[in-house]
Amino acid sequence: MTRAEPPIVNDRFAPRLALFYAAFFVMSGLHMMAFPVWLSAKGLDVAAIGIVLATPQFLRLIAIPVGTRLADRRGALNGPLAATALATAAGMVLVAFADGFTAILAAVVIVALVSAPVLPLSDAYALKGLAARGLSYGPVRLWGSVAFIAANLAGGLMLSTLAPVHLIWPIVATYAAMAVTTLMLVRLPATPRTPTERSHGH
Protein backbone atom coordinates (compact mmCIF):
# COMPACT_ATOMS: atom_id res chain seq x y z
CA MET A 1 0.00 0.00 0.00
CA THR A 2 1.54 3.26 -1.10
CA ARG A 3 1.51 6.33 1.06
CA ALA A 4 -0.43 9.26 -0.37
CA GLU A 5 1.55 12.41 -1.05
CA PRO A 6 0.71 15.18 1.45
CA PRO A 7 -1.21 18.07 -0.08
CA ILE A 8 0.81 21.16 -0.93
CA VAL A 9 -0.28 24.11 1.16
CA ASN A 10 -0.40 27.68 -0.14
CA ASP A 11 3.33 28.32 0.09
CA ARG A 12 3.33 31.42 -2.13
CA PHE A 13 5.22 29.51 -4.80
CA ALA A 14 3.71 31.41 -7.75
CA PRO A 15 4.16 34.97 -6.36
CA ARG A 16 7.77 34.29 -5.42
CA LEU A 17 8.45 32.80 -8.83
CA ALA A 18 6.77 35.78 -10.51
CA LEU A 19 9.04 38.09 -8.51
CA PHE A 20 12.08 36.20 -9.77
CA TYR A 21 10.93 36.46 -13.39
CA ALA A 22 10.22 40.17 -12.95
CA ALA A 23 13.70 40.74 -11.51
CA PHE A 24 15.35 38.64 -14.22
CA PHE A 25 13.74 40.51 -17.08
CA VAL A 26 14.25 43.93 -15.52
CA MET A 27 17.91 42.94 -15.42
CA SER A 28 17.85 41.73 -19.03
CA GLY A 29 16.02 44.78 -20.32
CA LEU A 30 18.27 47.30 -18.61
CA HIS A 31 21.42 45.40 -19.58
CA MET A 32 20.40 45.27 -23.22
CA MET A 33 19.76 48.99 -23.32
CA ALA A 34 22.48 50.46 -21.10
CA PHE A 35 25.46 48.10 -21.29
CA PRO A 36 26.58 49.06 -24.83
CA VAL A 37 26.38 52.74 -23.84
CA TRP A 38 28.57 52.06 -20.82
CA LEU A 39 31.08 50.18 -22.95
CA SER A 40 31.33 53.17 -25.25
CA ALA A 41 31.82 55.47 -22.26
CA LYS A 42 34.68 53.21 -21.15
CA GLY A 43 36.46 53.98 -24.40
CA LEU A 44 35.72 50.84 -26.44
CA ASP A 45 35.26 51.36 -30.16
CA VAL A 46 32.46 49.84 -32.23
CA ALA A 47 34.44 46.70 -33.12
CA ALA A 48 35.43 46.05 -29.51
CA ILE A 49 31.86 46.57 -28.31
CA GLY A 50 30.68 44.09 -30.93
CA ILE A 51 33.14 41.47 -29.66
CA VAL A 52 32.14 42.01 -26.02
CA LEU A 53 28.44 41.69 -26.87
CA ALA A 54 28.81 38.71 -29.21
CA THR A 55 31.16 36.58 -27.12
CA PRO A 56 28.55 35.62 -24.47
CA GLN A 57 26.20 34.37 -27.19
CA PHE A 58 28.78 31.83 -28.36
CA LEU A 59 29.76 30.80 -24.84
CA ARG A 60 26.15 30.08 -23.89
CA LEU A 61 26.09 27.31 -26.50
CA ILE A 62 28.59 25.49 -24.25
CA ALA A 63 27.61 26.71 -20.80
CA ILE A 64 23.88 26.02 -20.94
CA PRO A 65 24.04 22.24 -21.60
CA VAL A 66 26.95 21.78 -19.19
CA GLY A 67 25.28 23.71 -16.38
CA THR A 68 21.88 22.08 -16.77
CA ARG A 69 23.44 18.61 -17.03
CA LEU A 70 25.29 19.11 -13.75
CA ALA A 71 22.08 20.24 -12.08
CA ASP A 72 20.20 17.26 -13.51
CA ARG A 73 22.81 14.86 -12.13
CA ARG A 74 22.24 16.29 -8.67
CA GLY A 75 18.46 16.04 -9.02
CA ALA A 76 18.07 19.44 -7.37
CA LEU A 77 17.22 22.86 -8.77
CA ASN A 78 17.21 25.45 -5.98
CA GLY A 79 20.89 25.12 -5.13
CA PRO A 80 22.28 25.32 -8.68
CA LEU A 81 19.89 28.15 -9.56
CA ALA A 82 20.87 30.26 -6.55
CA ALA A 83 24.57 29.49 -7.01
CA THR A 84 24.64 30.52 -10.66
CA ALA A 85 22.57 33.65 -9.97
CA LEU A 86 24.84 34.77 -7.12
CA ALA A 87 27.95 34.03 -9.19
CA THR A 88 26.46 36.07 -12.03
CA ALA A 89 25.90 39.07 -9.76
CA ALA A 90 29.45 38.77 -8.42
CA GLY A 91 30.75 38.59 -11.97
CA MET A 92 29.00 41.83 -12.87
CA VAL A 93 30.85 43.53 -10.02
CA LEU A 94 34.07 42.40 -11.72
CA VAL A 95 32.80 43.91 -14.96
CA ALA A 96 32.06 47.20 -13.21
CA PHE A 97 35.62 47.51 -11.94
CA ALA A 98 37.27 46.25 -15.13
CA ASP A 99 39.15 48.80 -17.22
CA GLY A 100 40.16 48.38 -20.83
CA PHE A 101 39.01 45.98 -23.52
CA THR A 102 40.89 42.89 -22.33
CA ALA A 103 39.82 43.18 -18.69
CA ILE A 104 36.20 43.91 -19.58
CA LEU A 105 36.07 41.01 -22.04
CA ALA A 106 37.55 38.62 -19.47
CA ALA A 107 34.97 39.65 -16.87
CA VAL A 108 32.15 39.37 -19.40
CA VAL A 109 33.31 35.84 -20.28
CA ILE A 110 33.04 34.86 -16.61
CA VAL A 111 29.53 36.33 -16.40
CA ALA A 112 28.48 34.56 -19.59
CA LEU A 113 29.65 31.16 -18.37
CA VAL A 114 28.00 31.33 -14.95
CA SER A 115 24.81 33.09 -16.07
CA ALA A 116 23.92 30.86 -19.02
CA PRO A 117 22.15 28.14 -16.97
CA VAL A 118 20.07 30.60 -14.89
CA LEU A 119 17.05 30.84 -17.19
CA PRO A 120 16.94 27.12 -18.18
CA LEU A 121 17.22 26.13 -14.52
CA SER A 122 14.52 28.59 -13.48
CA ASP A 123 12.19 27.34 -16.20
CA ALA A 124 12.75 23.74 -15.10
CA TYR A 125 12.10 24.81 -11.50
CA ALA A 126 8.96 26.67 -12.55
CA LEU A 127 7.48 23.81 -14.56
CA LYS A 128 8.18 21.28 -11.81
CA GLY A 129 6.78 23.40 -9.00
CA LEU A 130 3.76 24.73 -10.87
CA ALA A 131 2.78 21.26 -12.08
CA ALA A 132 2.89 19.92 -8.53
CA ARG A 133 0.52 22.68 -7.48
CA GLY A 134 -1.82 22.50 -10.46
CA LEU A 135 -0.88 26.01 -11.57
CA SER A 136 -0.25 27.41 -15.06
CA TYR A 137 3.10 28.70 -16.30
CA GLY A 138 1.74 31.51 -18.49
CA PRO A 139 0.34 33.88 -15.85
CA VAL A 140 3.55 33.65 -13.80
CA ARG A 141 5.84 34.13 -16.79
CA LEU A 142 3.74 37.11 -17.90
CA TRP A 143 5.28 39.20 -15.13
CA GLY A 144 8.65 38.77 -16.79
CA SER A 145 7.35 40.25 -20.03
CA VAL A 146 5.72 43.16 -18.19
CA ALA A 147 8.95 43.81 -16.29
CA PHE A 148 11.00 43.74 -19.49
CA ILE A 149 8.84 46.45 -21.02
CA ALA A 150 9.00 48.51 -17.83
CA ALA A 151 12.79 48.15 -17.73
CA ASN A 152 13.09 49.50 -21.26
CA LEU A 153 10.93 52.50 -20.39
CA ALA A 154 12.91 53.17 -17.21
CA GLY A 155 16.17 52.59 -19.05
CA GLY A 156 15.34 55.26 -21.59
CA LEU A 157 14.82 57.77 -18.79
CA MET A 158 18.03 56.64 -17.12
CA LEU A 159 20.05 57.15 -20.28
CA SER A 160 18.91 60.75 -20.44
CA THR A 161 19.65 61.56 -16.80
CA LEU A 162 22.66 59.50 -15.74
CA ALA A 163 26.23 59.91 -16.97
CA PRO A 164 27.06 56.97 -19.29
CA VAL A 165 30.10 55.94 -17.26
CA HIS A 166 27.87 55.40 -14.22
CA LEU A 167 25.28 53.24 -16.00
CA ILE A 168 27.00 50.06 -14.87
CA TRP A 169 25.84 50.50 -11.27
CA PRO A 170 22.09 50.31 -11.94
CA ILE A 171 22.87 47.25 -14.07
CA VAL A 172 24.81 45.65 -11.20
CA ALA A 173 21.93 46.47 -8.85
CA THR A 174 19.45 44.60 -11.04
CA TYR A 175 21.76 41.57 -11.17
CA ALA A 176 22.00 41.61 -7.38
CA ALA A 177 18.22 41.90 -7.04
CA MET A 178 17.75 38.95 -9.38
CA ALA A 179 20.17 36.87 -7.31
CA VAL A 180 18.37 37.75 -4.07
CA THR A 181 15.04 36.59 -5.49
CA THR A 182 16.47 33.09 -6.09
CA LEU A 183 17.06 32.83 -2.34
CA MET A 184 13.37 33.60 -1.76
CA LEU A 185 12.07 30.80 -3.96
CA VAL A 186 10.22 27.92 -2.34
CA ARG A 187 12.54 24.94 -2.00
CA LEU A 188 11.53 21.96 -4.12
CA PRO A 189 12.47 18.39 -3.19
CA ALA A 190 15.23 16.88 -5.28
CA THR A 191 14.12 14.43 -7.94
CA PRO A 192 15.65 11.03 -7.08
CA ARG A 193 17.71 9.45 -9.82
CA THR A 194 17.03 5.89 -10.91
CA PRO A 195 19.66 3.17 -10.36
CA THR A 196 20.24 3.08 -14.13
CA GLU A 197 20.93 6.83 -14.23
CA ARG A 198 23.32 6.56 -11.29
CA SER A 199 25.22 3.66 -12.84
CA HIS A 200 25.62 5.48 -16.15
CA GLY A 201 26.42 8.84 -14.58
CA HIS A 202 23.56 10.58 -16.41
Name each model-derived stretch:
Residues 57-65, 148-149, 153:
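Residue-level signature of mid-helix packing/kink "hotspots" within the transmembrane helices
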Residues 79-94, 172:
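Structural signature of the two symmetry-related core transmembrane helices
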Residues 14, 96-108:
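Helix-loop junctions at membrane interfaces in 12-TM secondary transporters
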